[in-house]
Regions:
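Long, highly hydrophobic alpha-helical transmembrane signal-anchor segments
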Residues: 1-51
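Transmembrane alpha-helical segments of integral membrane proteins
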Residues: 22-25, 122-138
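Core segments of transmembrane alpha-helices
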Residues: 48, 89-102
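Membrane-helix interface/capping segments
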Residues: 53-78
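Short membrane-interface loop/juxtamembrane segments of multi-pass integral membrane proteins
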Residues: 70-94
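Hydrophobic alpha-helical transmembrane segments and immediately flanking/interface helices
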Residues: 101-129
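Interfacial loop-to-transmembrane junctions
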Residues: 130-155
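Juxtamembrane boundary at the C-terminal end of a transmembrane helix
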Residues: 158-175
């Protein structure tokens, strides 16, 4: 498992720290709340579409598999649909965190830091593909995909927690 998470952590750090090289400031939205939120929500479409793809995989499988057509509420389900549902559930969990992180990031962070959002979204979809492809191989097969999906969001949420706590403390202290 470590073999998958270490490269994912490295790619996350490289992506988020190297983003100024990849994405010039001129491509960012104007520094206005509506434009910032539009930027975040545009990129939030990537995790949402990843979730849609996961749901579609479950639906397509059910449509073509008589043992699974009745749905999870009425049948136990084949091992394949159980795996597809687990992937969809994990994608839902990751997408909720990512969309929240992108939105809060866009509202709270300096304009130049908005470049992190498209990198995080790109890593998200790459991670979801690798996670789904590796799922059958257990934790080691999922590790890289999970890391690429989760780590950018976790880093963003941790940074937001630090920045917003710092701002709140300064506000309370009257600075």
């Amino acid at each position: 498992m470590v073999r998958g998470v270490i490269p994912a952590a490295f790619l996350t750090v490289a992506g988020l720290c190297g983003v100024p090289i990849v994405l010039p400031l001129s491509l960012l939205p104007v520094d206005e709340p509506g434009a910032r939120l539009t930027w975040a929500l545009t990129w939030a479409l990537v995790p949402v579409l990843s979730l849609m793809a996961s749901i579609m995989r479950v639906a397509n499988h059910r449509f073509y598999t008589p043992d699974d057509i009745d749905g999870s509420g009425l049948t136990v389900g084949t091992s394949r649909v159980v795996i597809l549902r687990a992937i969809a559930q994990n994608t839902l969990e990751q997408a909720v965190l990512a969309v929240a992180a992108y939105s809060i990031w866009a509202a709270a962070m300096p304009r130049s830091w908005l470049r992190a959002i498209p990198i995080a979204a790109s890593l998200f979809v790459t991670g979801r593909i690798l996670f789904a492809r590796g799922y059958d191989r257990g934790a080691a097969g999922r590790a890289m995909g999970f890391g690429l999906t989760a780590y950018p969001t976790f880093v963003m949420l941790a940074a937001l927690s630090i920045v917003l706590t710092y701002r709140a403390v300064n506000w309370v202290l009257g600075r």
